[in-house]
Amino acid sequence: NRDARLQVLDEHGLEAVWLFPTLGVLYEELLKHDPEAVGITFRAFNRWLEEDWGFAYRDRIFAAPYFSLADVGWAVEELEWALGRGAHVICIRPAAVWTAKGPRSPASTEFDPFWARVAEAGVTVVAHAADSGYTSHGYADDGFSSSFEGFAGPNVKLFNIERAAHDFFATLVFDKLFERFPNLRVASVENGSEFLGDLFKKLRSTANKYAGWFRDDPVESFREHVWVNPFWEDDVR
């Protein structure tokens, strides 16, 4: 009920919210070896999301349709559909893109038709915590997408979300996505912020090792184009 949700926003003193899928961010990993199935699944998901919530209900509830770049033609077509229905924000997972030809960097130039349209439209792309396909290499039970049992205690699998976000954003900078599309706006949601210190250190180190590779300072490029939602317990000093 959209209006009931607006009432809750009013009770909490919130002007507007972004609305993300809880389980929808898990399924691309399960289907990644079948790009056609990925497209069919998320086209259906996005139609349901728009029907139930809308993409900009009263300019207060901004539901985020989910996008995969597994088929860039599909992604561009789906983006046009979402933009035509008022989408302000879209959701992707922080992971390599699994295409019919194998995995690719999300900043590969083969995906430029999608990124170009995103930049032109001015919508925000959210890299939301998801099943990004990371493994604990035997230190803990994997299979995030297929198991919803509670954790008995801490293990290294807890760092997978941060590892995925770190690698995703490093790749966007390394592959010069923001240099090609200076109007892009990307947000990191539910990935925390503790990975930032190490990311900035590595970006500076890489710039020194590969002198002349970057047109812009990589750390400043990140700061200009990426907004990060920290966990409440993160030390952001």
Give the residues covered by each predicted segment:
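Helix-coil boundary/capping segments in enzymes
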Residues: N1-R237
